[in-house]
Amino acid sequence: MQAEPAFDAKAFCAGLPSQPGVYRMMNSAGQVIYVGKAIDLKKRVSSYFQKNGLAPRTQLMVSQIAGIETTVTRSEAEALLLENNLIKSLNPRYNILFRDDKSYPYVILSGHRFPRLGFHRGPLDKKHHYFGPFPNAGMVRESIQLLQKVFRIRTCEDSVFSNRTRPCLLYQIKRCSGPCVDLVSEEVYAEDARDAELFLQGKQTEVLKSITRKMHEAAEEQEYEQAALFRDQIQSLRKICERQFVDSGRALDADIVACVAENNGGGRVCVNLAMVRGGRHLGDKSFFPQNAEGYDLATVAEAFLAQHYLNRSIPDLIIVGERVPRESLQALLTQQAGHKVIINVNPIGSRRVWLEMATENAALALEQMLGRQASQEERLLALQQALDMTGLSRIECFDISHTMGEATIASCVVYDNFGMRNSEYRRYNITDITPGDDYAAMRDVLSRRYHKIAEGEGNLPDLILIDGGRGQINAALEVMVELGLNDANLVGVAKGEERKPGLEQLIFPGVKKPLQLSKDHPGLHLIQQIRDEAHRFAIYGHRAKLGKARVSSSLEQIAGIGAKRRQSLLARFGGLKGVRTASIEELQQADGISRALAEKIYRELH
């Protein structure tokens, strides 16, 4: 077989155009190892093959180049967009990679006649109003709780709202004004919803004026209880403003991006993103990019801006602590956002203070991450030594969860590169086995998980943990032998005689005596961490499946209740719980339910 000719960099570069575009560098296996953009393709690509001035990391990358492909674009901004689409899809070895697949959450104020306040993640619907995005779900829930306390907006689903006959607990604790049972007029509720919307838009001054006016009007009409309620609203709002608003002058939307590196460069990097919407500081989020070691912080910041805002909501202002190429990034982000986006790399005054705070948070997050990683490295090394293994990195753990054989779920969680990899977790519905047969369930999930690896797709993890004892590990071994994966490293994690944490025994195939590590052994702590996560993930899925099954089965067992009537009942009362608490008269109001059938349903459920 004739060898592939060596890559002739000089000849290749000579034929490149002096135009903007994107280049893809490939190794001898045809894998893309780096994607880059250029204002001038000829100059940029040629610079990689100069004799001096290349960083060691770049030299290593260039030594692996076996081919280069280029795409000419109409502008630098277009090249930047294409570059980052390719980086997202190809995950090249030498590109800085930011992984954050989950979309950001929003507060939603629905378009209902009595608007509902809620948590939303996913596509936006023009019928509703959305506020955010927020950096994490916790900040959304905190905002909802604050808005409930101040404006008493409902949070119940529309199906529950339309079928209530008495106010819920939230009304009793003054977190809802009770529109479901007409305890507040539509006009008054609409005013409260409008004030909540204005507040979320950052127009807190307007909201305070509105509530103050209503307080004075109530006092003049000697409605002192109502006036006191407005007074409490004003006090709560002022406290929130003191804590959350960073720019009381106007409803500012801005992101603040700060970067720090371990040991002032050369090590791990953290990018902290602080979000301000409507003048409110919504919190921050830290990112730890892959392959960023050795790059200067300006390059890291540029990669973050280009990758993070791809197909995401973009604010009017982005404050960055590094000298990034403003013109091309502003052009790209403005095009993406559909409105003008300004990148400020030299903030002054209060905005400089925001950047300093974001930088401090980035440094703190990096310090905490490195501390956790050091602990994980210690645990992983201890486990390697205890198991007499080398090169231990990727661990997968399996658990089975069911209730007396019902709603069986298997979980697989993944530990890799010193941390749990949530995006790689998987749940498996287990059917077609004898209910309660844990061994059959384990055979099923392992066969489904590893059959593609047996066919040559992908690689086995370095270690497979099975939550269970000798029977479970034997079942796992049978599957691996059947699949031809005899070199799989299997370890069973049995709870020990007293089933107490710290007394776990490690079971090995073909080894009669189990291994029991001391309670304070770092390797045991890592196994417990992974096993507990598999257990949690399995139970969560099992409970969801069980709840869904029982909602249907409780009504299905009642003679005369078919799919149509069951759906009518669940829709009217907002679920099985609502059906159970309904009176005979209330049940009778559902479509297709006669008096006799309502009495039968009531008897069966009580």
From Swiss-Prot:
Domain UVR: 205-240
Gene3D superfamilies linked to this entry: 5' to 3' exonuclease, C-terminal subdomain, GIY-YIG endonuclease, UVR domain, UvrC, RNAse H endonuclease domain
Places the protein is found: Cytoplasm
One Pfam family cited in the UniProt record for this chain: UvrC_RNaseH_dom
GO cellular component: cytoplasm; excinuclease repair complex
Keywords tagged on the record: Cytoplasm, DNA damage, DNA excision, DNA repair, Excision nuclease, SOS response
PROSITE patterns: GIY_YIG, UVR, UVRC
GO molecular function, one term: DNA binding
Predominant subcellular localization, coarse grouping: cytoplasm
Domain GIY-YIG: from-to ranges: 18-96
One GO BP: nucleotide-excision repair
Subunit description: Interacts with UvrB in an incision complex.
Biological role: The UvrABC repair system catalyzes the recognition and processing of DNA lesions. UvrC both incises the 5' and 3' sides of the lesion. The N-terminal half is responsible for the 3' incision and the C-terminal half is responsible for the 5' incision.
Protein family according to the UniProt entry: Belongs to the UvrC family.
UniProt-recorded name of the protein: UvrABC system protein C
